[in-house]
Each structure stands twice: as structure tokens, then as C-alpha cells.
């Protein structure tokens, strides 16, 4: 049996140590990482993966695209897929900055906690202009939720919403939430609230969500205090607070890691797997 080889194409200068560790834990026998990968130089790397093994042996080679910039990762991922033709292809996965696995885990846990459906309900993503927030908005909208993607500046929030709508064929709206007052206003009438902001910034004080009767579930992706949502713990995984449930970053992170490992394992099950947000989310729902 051929060794399971994972080639890590990273858009940053140095390939992610985190992704290497999870890659091995997911079943790879050997990982080779390349930094500063772009759509212009990735072709030669892809050729090395698709022309070296034949038949069933080809499924023992796989590609992982990562790095800190999701937009750059998406461009590289598209270039990788365009290089494939006929049987000359290997399985590939996109998870720049952990965005796909993190968002998939968070949304899957919330949907499960909501009874399996969020259709027709309102979901607000605060500080949603980054890759995790955008992916979360996309997955929630794909589940039929009415999604509002919020940012400090309306033009940036609108650009993020437009990007999500174009990529995922959904209808996410944008809102400006520059301060505590506007964020508290934005979550009024919402059933679900996600916070995807930078480290060290509380986006939603405890009173703003605990006193809003419509809110059923809150979820925060920031593990470092102060958390994005006041009054919860990073380890919360569906913990109840006055009839509402909360998910903290570490509560979500357990599934995120299991999901990442499971995706790596699946890369080696065939030579035709493509794991982007939709495919990763499908697996997350099975695992949640």
C-alpha cells in the first residue's frame, strides 16, 4: 500500500504548524508543505501530485490548501482544481485560517441545538466580515435562515455579504454595527447570534443578549478573554443561561478539530474528493 502523502499549499510564507499536526492526526503518513503558494506557481506542484501514481494508488496522494488569507486560498484552490483533468486528479481540501472547519462546526452545533432546522429564523453574525464570519453567514443562509452580516463599516459589510451571495447563491444582507448600541440594536428580533471578531474585543455584553427575548442560541468563535459574548465561557457547548443556550470557542473547537481530522482521512478514500465549505459542512452535520 502506498504511503499517504499530503501536500500542503500555504499562501503564507511558512506553512501552518497547526495544519501539519492535524494532518498527521488525520492519517497522513508524510506531509510536505510549501509556502508563498500562488495561482501562478501552484501548477507545477499539482503536476507532481497527479502524474506520479496511477490507479488506486492515486488516492494516497492529496492536497490541502491553507494560509491566513481565505481570499488568497480560494484563488489557489481554484487554480488547483483547474489543473485537474480526466483521471489526472487527486482529492483536495480548502481550509485557509481554519475558516471552513471552524464555521462548519459552529453552524452545525447551533443547527442541531435548534432542533435540526433554522429555516425562516433570523441569524445575526457580528464582526462577520472575516472568513469565519462570512462562511458562517453562508452556511446559515444555506439552511434557510434570514442572515444579517454585520461589520463596523457598512461598505465592508456589504462587500462581504455580496461576496457570500455570489459564491454561495444565497441572500445575506449587511448592516453597520460600529458600537455596542448598534450591535445591541442589530440583535433585536434575532433567534441566533454569532460573533466572529478579533481577539480581545467583547462585541455583545451579557445584558444585550440575555434581555432579548427572541434570542435562542449564541455562539462565539473567540477563545481568548475577553470573549466576544459577555457572560459565557469559552468551554460552553450548549450550556443554558436563563433559557438560552451558548456555545463558546472551545466548545466549538472540539468538533472543529475532529472535523478537520475526519476531512483529512476522507481525502485518502478516493482521488476525486473536493472539500470546500459545503462538503465540510455536510460532514460536520453528521458529526455534531
UniProtKB/Swiss-Prot annotation:
Query: What is the predominant subcellular site recorded for this chain?
Result: cytoplasm
Pathway assignment: One-carbon metabolism; formaldehyde degradation; formate from formaldehyde (H(4)MPT route): step 2/5
EC supergroup of this enzyme: oxidoreductase
Q: Which UniProt keywords apply?
A: Cytoplasm, NADP, One-carbon metabolism, Oxidoreductase
EC numbers listed for it are: 1.5.1.-, 1.5.1.5
Q: What does this protein do?
A: Catalyzes the dehydrogenation of methylene-H(4)MPT. Can also catalyze the reversible dehydrogenation of methylene-H(4)F with 20-fold lower catalytic efficiency.
Q: What is this protein called?
A: Bifunctional protein MdtA
